[in-house]
Amino acid sequence: MADQLIRATAAEDGIRAVGVITTRLTEEARQRHKLSYVATAALGRTMAAGLLLASSMKQPQARVNIRIKGDGPLEGLFVDAGCDGTVRGYVYNPAIELPPNAKGKLDVGGAVGSQGYLYVIRDLGYGYPYSSTVELVSGEIAEDITHYLVTSEQTPSALVLGVFVTEAGVTAAGGVLIQVLPKAAQDEALVEKLESRISALSGFTPLLQRGLSLSEIFEQLLGDMGLTILPQRQLVRFHCRCSFDRMLGALKILGSDELQDMIDRDNGAEATCHFCGEVYQASSEQLAELIDELKAEAGG
């Protein structure tokens, strides 16, 4: 099943729902960063969450940044997701592995840690970005981002995220975000029914492994609540905006002395993109050209 995002409404537009499948892009991130099982789950959950949050933004260039800094051995992670369906990200300590938790599942909460902060930045592409910071609740990602949505955006929300990874790689990943808007929030019976449905879920990835599509998952959750699945399906993918030219621009900022030192010491330069793991190499000749450009710009 292709990585994709779909949107839906229910309860006469009083409920907003978004679902995303991110199996392939999570596997690409795992391979690019050489992630452990638990690091794959942590980053995969957060990339799915980033795409779900970004989906509510209207501007084509709008993006959501999620940064988590916890006291666990993973140390932290960063995700950049756009409403155009692109996402990238990295973890600070990609190789750490932990024993399964008490439920026999990957111990994402233990890896991230329960003490720390979740930072969310919404950037419309113009003006000042909107940023918010909340304390971590559990380090399990979904609970922490739900806490952010309820406290910072004052929107009752339920977020279910999952990543299933084996020795063969990621076989299922994605999530569902359901939000109760003000017009439906006063209907206690509706809210209780929705909470009961979500609590009864065994997780997101088991549904994908059973072969259910996002539409079928929505039917299971909201089918008797006036569900309307919007026709537009958006493809999502791992995509990094790094390039060789951007790398040269970053090197140029270092200045002539540092560039000359790289030429003398290393006969060139090598840089690795944090977001995607792509390695770029600049020759001594290319560094010399940057030095010439700096001299010309300085008028000498």
Curated annotation (Swiss-Prot):
Residue stretches spanning the membrane: none
Protein's UniProt keywords contain Zinc: yes
InterPro entries: Heat_shock_Hsp33 (IPR000397), Heat_shock_Hsp33_C (IPR016154), Heat_shock_Hsp33_N (IPR016153)
Locations listed in the record: Cytoplasm
Molecular function GO labels: protein folding chaperone; unfolded protein binding
Keyword annotations of the record: Chaperone, Cytoplasm, Disulfide bond, Redox-active center, Zinc
Predominant cellular place of this UniProt entry's protein: cytoplasm
Post-translational changes noted in the entry: Under oxidizing conditions two disulfide bonds are formed involving the reactive cysteines. Under reducing conditions zinc is bound to the reactive cysteines and the protein is inactive.
Record has rRNA-binding as a keyword: no
Biological process according to GO: protein refolding
One GO CC term on file: cytoplasm
Pfam families associated with the record: HSP33 (PF01430)
Domain of life: Bacteria
PANTHER family the UniProt entry points to: 33 KDA CHAPERONIN (PTHR30111:SF1)
Record NCBIfam families: PRK00114.1
Family under the similarity heading: Belongs to the HSP33 family.
Function: Redox regulated molecular chaperone. Protects both thermally unfolding and oxidatively damaged proteins from irreversible aggregation. Plays an important role in the bacterial defense system toward oxidative stress.
Protein name: 33 kDa chaperonin
Organism: Cyanothece sp. (strain PCC 7425 / ATCC 29141)
